[in-house]
Structures are given as C-alpha cells and as structure tokens.
Design a protein with these regions (language model features):
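Walker A/P-loop nucleotide-binding motif
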Residues: 246-265
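C-terminal alpha-helical "lid" subdomain
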Residues: 385, 389-447
Length: 447
C-alpha cells in the first residue's frame, strides 16, 4: 500500500542534506543521498512500504560493505559519515590539508555544513524503523564486526576514521565539529592522499590517469635493513630536507640486486608519512603520463616521491626522454613538492653498446658519441646517487646474525655460518635478500 500519512521529522534528513553547500558535491547515487531521498519519498507517501523497505535494505547493505572494506566497528552510521568528511575533496578541505583552517568567509559555510553533519550524527532512526518494521539502523549503530586479517583491509584508514568518528560523537555543536575535522585535515590531509601512503597510476581513457592506493604496503622501517648505514643516512638527509621544505635532490639508488634499495625507499615513506610524505610508483611504460601525474599533484600540500623501481633502458627504448624532460623541466618551473627516487642495477641506467662508442656519423647526421652522451647524461640528472654494493662474506654473516637475533632463532654462530653459507651457494649468492630468505627458511622449520 502507498503511505499517505505525513510522518513528522522523517523528511528531516532530506532537508538536512539539501542544506549542504561545500560538502554537497556528492554523487546522487551515494548512500547519504539515496537515504535522504528514501525518507523524502516516505514522507510524501509516494512509495509503498515494501519498496521503501527494499531501498532501505539496499543502502544499509552498502554501509555494511564499506564497513567490511575498512573493518569499521561500533557505530557504522557515524563511521560512514566520518568517512565522507575525510574523503570529500572540496575547496575548503583541500585548503586545510596539512596546514589547518585559516580565517576567512568560507569558514561560515563550512560551519553551516558541519551543523548539518552534527544533525546527521544525532539523527533518530527509530520512527522510520517503527513504520517500516525494521531494526537495521539500530543494529549498525552498535555493530560487532568479525575480526579480519590486516591484509584484507587498509588498517591505516580504518583506525583514522574510527578515531575521528569517536571524537565527533562528543562534539557539542558545529564549532567543536569544525575544530575536530580541520585538526584532522591539518594532521593527515583529506581524500585519497590524506589517508594513504603510496599509490600506483592507472590509465582511464582519453589520456587521463587516476591514482590507486596501495592498501597494504610493506611496514618496513630503516632499522629493519641491517648494515648500509652510510647509504641510509644519505637518503635520510635528503628526504628530511625535502619534507621540511628545504632544497633536495632527485635520488638514484644503484647497485647489486637484493641489497635493500627498494626496501630503503619503502622504509623512508613509512617513516615520514606523518610529515606529509607520499609515494607514487610508476612503471617505465607509464613515463608518457609523467606530466599528467605531476599536473594532478603539484598543487597539493604533500611531498611526493615519484618512485621508479629497477630503472634501466635498452638501446632501442626511448622512454628515458620522457624522464629527462620531467627532471630538466621546460618553460614551467618544476614543482617543489615532487622528487624522483629511482633504483637500478645499472650505474648509467641505459645500456651502452659498441655502436655508441663509435664516432662514425649515423644517418641523421649525429655523431654516435653524441647519442651515447645524451643517454648516459640521464644519471647526472639525479643530484644524489647512492651505491648499494653486495656485502662481503663477513658482512653477510653479520646480517644473518642480526636477522636471526631479531627473529628469535636459537642457533650458535658457527652453525648459522655453516648453514647460511650453504644457503647462499644454492640461492643466488651473497646479498641481504638472500640472508632474509635464509632466516625465513629457518623460521619455517621452527614453526
């Protein structure tokens, strides 16, 4: 049957949401917009109970899906609203990211929106539940989530959303709401870049790209990398200058495979995330999109490392030209909030051939030595180059001893040496990676 009776207060959610100005840029298919429309239809009596109940269940299911993705617990409605607030990129929130709120007329509009969100936080669903004969909103207001392994969700996002949600529950009015939300923007930022440490890029047609968060980045820190203290210190000094707004250089980490080059960069991102450092991993075939990537991040209040792993070029590859163009810059000044950190097994990045060494002119009238110089000059565009060389056998054993100690492996040094030596002979030779794989093997045996 069609509901003809007007239920006082039910349309209130629609009225609240319709007042949003700065945060009103939500898609019509978003959960909040759909719920507000459901309650409007209910108040107008334009749909049957069965239709309204089905629509309500659909949106509650979507809230549960968001909660599952981020391992939300307790009040899922509050968690969802908080998630909206800290992922909504608008002129106000972006201005506040990493610097906080400033005096200005926009604060009046923001507080008006936060008053609406405060009303949504306190929204009473009981009348709707009574009329439709459901209890789903009561259930998600005190939800007991099933425990999930960390690899199945983004723990960083989960913890931040739930912590802010619990704070917002205590806000007395829109002024306290304003302070709490803008404090969050100052501490972490807003949207995808505020909540995540690292990203990859994806092509999405028409020469456009979008960023995809890396949800479960390795939690490694620099102290986990045994040895290489000089190398780590050089990387730290350059990165600290960068995040503090001082002059810093692009960095090339080169050397033997398995020596900790990639691990060092991941560790740097983990250690300086709270200071606004973010990483965007880009592959060689995506270098054509570099200018597009830079255009999308240059005006954000973060420090971005564009990370290129295992960087090298064969003689016939020309992608290095895109990289050189970005590093050198053109008419436009290179943004100060972007650096390139790359790893490579090659010191000069581009394979040099005997033809390159010849000074015979090619068909284009250029000396081959000029071509070689153009290729090899790429490495000079990195202001800091750090050599990660293969450890000596003594250093290899020291790495094994330290990793064994951290792992709680009870084995004498002589036996460790003997077994570690056997392992490296059949597993690719001496390196930090080989040492870690050996320790993983021992840990598996102990289990």
């Amino acid at each position: 049957m069609i509901l003809r009776k007007k239920f006082g207060g039910i349309q209130e959610m629609y009225n609240i949401v319709s007042k949003l100005l700065i945060y009103g840029n939500m898609d019509e298919e978003s959960i909040l917009m759909q719920l507000s429309d459901i309650f409007r239809c209910m108040d107008e009596g334009s749909q049957t109970k069965d239709v309204l109940r089905t629509r309500v269940f659909k949106q509650v299911k979507r809230i549960l899906e968001v909660a599952t993705d981020y391992a939300f617990d307790k009040n899922l409605w509050h968690n969802y609203l908080t998630y909206l607030l800290i992922t909504n990129e608008n002129p106000f929130s972006i201005t506040c990211e990493k610097v906080g709120a400033s005096e200005g007329s926009v604060n009046h509009f923001a507080k008006s929106d936060f008053k609406a969100f405060k009303e949504l936080f306190d929204f009473d669903f009981s009348r709707i539940e009574d009329e439709l004969g459901v209890d789903c909103f009561s259930r998600i207001s005190d939800y007991q989530a099933i425990g999930k392994p960390e690899l199945m969700y983004n723990k960083n996002v989960s913890e931040k959303v739930q912590a802010l949600s619990e704070r917002l529950e205590t806000a007395k009015d829109e002024n306290e709401f304003f302070d709490m939300v803008t404090d969050f923007y100052k501490a972490y930022g807003v949207g995808m870049f505020g909540l995540n440490k690292a990203f990859r890029i994806e092509e999405c047609g028409d020469n456009n790209i979008r960023f995809r968060a890396i949800n479960n980045m390795d939690k490694v820190v620099l102290s986990d990398l045994v040895g290489y203290e000089i190398q780590k210190q050089k990387l730290v000094e350059n990165t600290e200058a960068f995040v503090e707004g001082r002059k810093a250089n692009n960095v090339l980490l080169f050397g033997d495979s398995g020596t900790g080059k990639s691990t060092s960069i991941k560790a740097i991102v983990n250690e300086y995330y709270d200071q606004g450092l973010r990483m965007i991993e880009i592959y060689k075939h995506q270098f054509k999109d570099l200018s597009n990537v830079i255009a999308q991040i240059k005006n954000r209040n973060y420090r971005f490392i564009i990370y290129m792993d295992d960087l090298s070029f064969e003689e016939f590859e020309i992608e290095y030209k895109f990289l050189k163009a970005v590093i050198e810059g053109g008419v436009e000044t290179k943004p100060e909030n972007i650096l390139i950190y790359a790893t490579s097994n090659r010191r000069h990045l581009i394979k040099e051939t005997w033809n390159d060494r010849s000074d015979v002119e090619n068909s284009n009238g250029m000396h081959r030595s000029d071509t070689m110089e153009e290729k090899l000059s790429l490495v000079n565009r990195f202001g800091v180059t750090i050599n990660y060389s293969k450890p000596s056998q003594k250093e290899y054993f020291e790495i094994v001893f330290e990793l064994a100690r951290k792992a709680g492996i009870k084995m004498g040094e002589d036996e460790l040496k003997l077994e570690a030596n056997k392992w490296e002979l059949s597993h690719g030779g001496i390196s930090g990676r080989t040492a870690q794989q050996f320790i993983n093997h021992l840990m598996g045996l102990q289990a």
